[in-house]
Each structure stands twice: as C-alpha cells, then as structure tokens.
Amino acid sequence: MNNTFPLILAPMAGVTDKAFRHMCKKHGADRLVTEMVSAKAVCFGDEKTAILAHIDSGERPCSLQLFGSEPDIMAKAAVICAEKFTPDAIDVNMGCPAPKIVNNGDGSAVMKSPELAYEIIARMRDALDGGGFSDMPLTVKMRSGFDSAHINAVEVALMCEKGGAAEVTVHGRTREQMYAP
C-alpha cells in the first residue's frame, strides 16, 4: 500500500456496517468510518443506534459519523460517542442528500448556512475539549454545495476549520446531483 495517499473508506448509510468495515480493513483500507448515526438517537440512548455506532478493535482506526443540525445536541452526542464508543475521530455529516435527512435540515442541508456549520463544529469542539477529549479529531464530510447555484464548499470548509475541524472531505457533487455519475 502506498501510504502517500491513505485509502479511506467513505461512510455510506446502509453499506458501511461492521461486516463491511472488517472486509475493507482486511483488503487494505487505512481508515474506516461508521454508517452515519443520528445525534438525537445517540442522546436518547437508542439501542439500534448503539449497534451502528459500536467500533471494535479490528476496525481501528475508525471514525464515527454523526448527523444532525442542532449544535447543542451535536455537542452532547459527540461527548457521549467519545465516552461510549471510543472512536478514533468523530466525523460530521454535511453531505447526505437523502430527502428524509435534508428535509429535517440535516446532512447536506447544513451547507445552506455556513454559520450553522461553524456553530455545530465549534460547539462540538468545545464540548469534546471540556469533556476531556481534546485529542479527539473532529472531521467533516460535505458536498461541493447544495445545488449548482450554491457551490460553497470552500466557504463552509473554512468555517468548519475556524470552528475546530481537523479535516474536511468533499464529495465532488452537489446535493442536487445526488449520486449521479
């Protein structure tokens, strides 16, 4: 494996479950990411969410991906996840294009407001730092923009960096493009 550019498994709801992550690790993935999990469900202690979020020793390094759009809930969920699931990083989903996610203001809908993106990351960073997890990397997965009239990945990425994100990954399509080739 050429480690100049690490092979990182992209988080995909309904795909990157524990069995798939183990298979990818076996075949050379350098870094894994869980399926996205709801910050609200984490805060409510949902059992199905706990199963999705569980990371075992054979999956390391592995990030846990959270989605949500309420800064306080995202912050609380980040600390719960750091304590309960001990991920190697926490990734924030600002890229999911699914209508049921976007219609709630989550996923790629967050990109409509760079200020909200900043607030989410800043609150999460503060909560992690205050909870004893200052060494926990906070990363973001986003799209190039919400639609072709709003290509704002650079602006949102800079706001996330200002808020405390250590890394940003850009899916080179807009929400409008969904998964089109």
PLM region descriptions:
Residues 1-181:
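Flavin-dependent oxidoreductase catalytic cores
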